[in-house]
Amino acid sequence: MSHDSDDKTFPYEKDDAELRRRLTPMQYEVTQHAATERAFTGEYTDTEDDGIYKCVVCSTPLFESGSKFHSGCGWPSYFKPLNGEVIDEKVDYSHGMVRVEVRCNHCGAHLGHVFEDGPRDQTGLRYCINSAALNFESRPENE
């Protein structure tokens, strides 16, 4: 599933050759072709450090560690994005399912999907995100 056929345009212009040089093959396939890394293999699945998760393509801050929770699904899960402006949602009909795809609203990178089975005491949502779509920036301990 490539984003090339999508009508939406994003502010950050991506150069494919530059992305192929800069990203790992998994990061490229996940963000540019909506691939999914295998469950429980991602770098940030169990990360509990305090900080911000950013888009691996354009460095837009997407999620903060305070919204991360252990869902048991095998991918990093968050109950909300950093704010309502950073995420683009699109209905995804791939693989014989109807899901809601989550993309970076700045560059269009595929991040994962959002489901309505998150913590009920929060938003009730579970943003199920590929580690390969993220970079983590820890906060200094004195902040």
Curated annotation (Swiss-Prot):
Transmembrane segments: none annotated. Disulfide bonds: none annotated. One of its GO terms (molecular function) is peptide-methionine (R)-S-oxide reductase activity. Binds 1 zinc ion per subunit. The zinc ion is important for the structural integrity of the protein. It is an enzyme of class 1 (oxidoreductase). Zn(2+) binds at C55, C58, C104, C107. It holds the Pfam family SelR. Belongs to the MsrB Met sulfoxide reductase family. This is Peptide methionine sulfoxide reductase MsrB.
